[in-house]
Every structure is written in structure tokens, then in C-alpha cells.
Design a protein with these regions (language model features):
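N-terminal intrinsically disordered/low-complexity leader segments
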Residues: 1-7, 190-195
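Helix-turn-helix
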Residues: 11, 15, 19-53, 57
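Hydrophobic alpha-helical connector segments
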Residues: 57, 71-100, 151-155
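Short, basic, alpha-helical segments at the C-terminal edge of helix-turn-helix-like DNA-binding modules
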Residues: 60-66
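Amphipathic alpha-helical packing segments from all-alpha helical-bundle domains
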Residues: 80-83, 115-140, 150-153, 180-184
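Amphipathic C-terminal alpha-helical segment
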Residues: 92, 136, 156-174, 185-194
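Amphipathic alpha-helical segments used for helix-helix packing
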Residues: 96-121
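Hydrophobic alpha-helical segments that form the core
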Residues: 101-110, 146-165, 177-185
């Protein structure tokens, strides 16, 4: 008979978040989840409701942490704050270890089809948060309000592209180059307003 392991729920979900973030959903079996998180198969079923529910709980944890992050809060500091958001995201000295895997939510969207409502709900939360933060800052910063909607979408797309670039390369340099270019573009919007 195997020994049961007690693991604190918060630590278990954090470990699951890191595991799913780095490995994805489909490639993980319950044995690997058990070995790397300390969550027994029994606990996986009875406490978390199975692998998919644990995955969704881990994704919720990621989104909660993102909502509270200083990096996301930097967007509120005008065009310079937005530029720094991108530059910080690609800076390996500023990045959380899991961040080298790109964006957990973007990785999830690439792995799953669009017909899973629980994943779509979390994607909507993520995109809504990004759009609102970018749009609010642009609305407060740009004189020409007709550019806010289009530039908001450019920034959301740039966020996705940067995260894909970070995930795709073992070395940080391509992401850093891209982030710096995005930062320069955002700063130029302020110069356009003054011209």
C-alpha cells in the first residue's frame, strides 16, 4: 500500500501551475502530476475533481497572480509604463522562472481548441484585463482618441507575439529585441502627439 503524502493546497496548485505551464496539459499523466506536485491520484480526484479541474485551478492561479503583478500595474504609468511592460516581460533578469515558458494562457490557447468553454472563459478574462489596462492608459495619454481602439489591439497582439517569441527561443535575445522595438513604437506615439 502506498503512503499518502500531505501537501498544502496552495503549494500544490502552484506546483501544478508550474508543471502545466512548462509541459502543457496533454503530455502530463497523473503519475507525473503526483510525482512533481505531491498530489496523490486520490486527492487529484476527490479534492480537485480530476486533471482538467486541477489544470483550470492552476490557470486561475496564474490569472490571479497576473492581475496582482507589478509588471501589469506598470501599464498604468502612461506610454513609458506600457513600453516598460514589454521590456520587463522580455528581460531575463526580471522574469519569473516559469515566464521563460511564455504566457501560460497563450500556451493553453495554442494547445486547446476553441470549443472548451472553461478555457474560453479564462481567455476572455485575460484579454479583457489586457484590453482594459491598455485602453485606459491610452485614453488618458493620447490626445487623438480615435487611435485608442486600434492601438489597444496592436498592444494586445504585441503581447501575444512577444510571449510566443519568448516561448519559441531558448535564448532571451530575440524576445529582448522584439520588446525593445515595441517599446520604441509605443514611445513614438507620444512624439506623434507632440508633433
Amino acid at each position: 500500500m502506498s503512503r499518502s503524502r500531505k501537501v498544502e493546497a496552495g503549494a500544490a496548485v502552484s506546483a501544478a501551475m508550474s508543471l502545466f505551464w512548462s509541459k502543457g496539459y496533454a503530455s502530463l499523466g497523473t503519475r507525473q502530476i503526483e510525482e512533481e506536485t505531491g498530489i496523490t491520484r486520490f486527492t487529484l480526484q476527490t479534492t480537485y475533481g480530476g486533471k482538467m479541474k486541477l489544470f483550470l485551478t492552476a490557470l486561475d492561479r496564474y490569472l490571479d497572480l497576473l492581475d496582482q503583478s507589478e509588471m501589469l500595474a506598470s501599464i498604468d504609468a502612461g506610454l513609458e509604463g506600457i513600453a516598460q511592460f514589454f521590456e520587463t516581460r522580455a528581460d531575463p533578469t526580471q522574469m519569473h522562472e516559469d515566464g521563460c515558458q511564455g504566457c501560460f494562457l497563450l500556451n493553453t490557447l495554442i494547445e486547446f481548441s476553441a470549443d472548451i468553454p472553461e478555457v474560453n472563459k479564462r481567455a476572455t478574462r485575460y484579454f479583457t484585463t489586457l484590453r482594459q489596462k491598455f485602453a485606459t492608459t491610452l485614453e488618458d495619454t493620447l490626445i487623438d482618441k480615435t487611435k485608442v481602439a486600434a492601438r489597444t489591439e496592436v498592444l494586445v497582439s504585441a503581447t501575444l507575439g512577444l510571449n510566443a517569441m519568448i516561448r519559441a527561443h531558448e535564448q532571451p535575445q530575440p524576445g529582448v529585441v522584439m520588446a525593445n522595438a515595441i517599446g520604441d513604437m509605443v514611445r513614438s506615439w507620444g512624439e506623434d502627439e507632440q508633433a
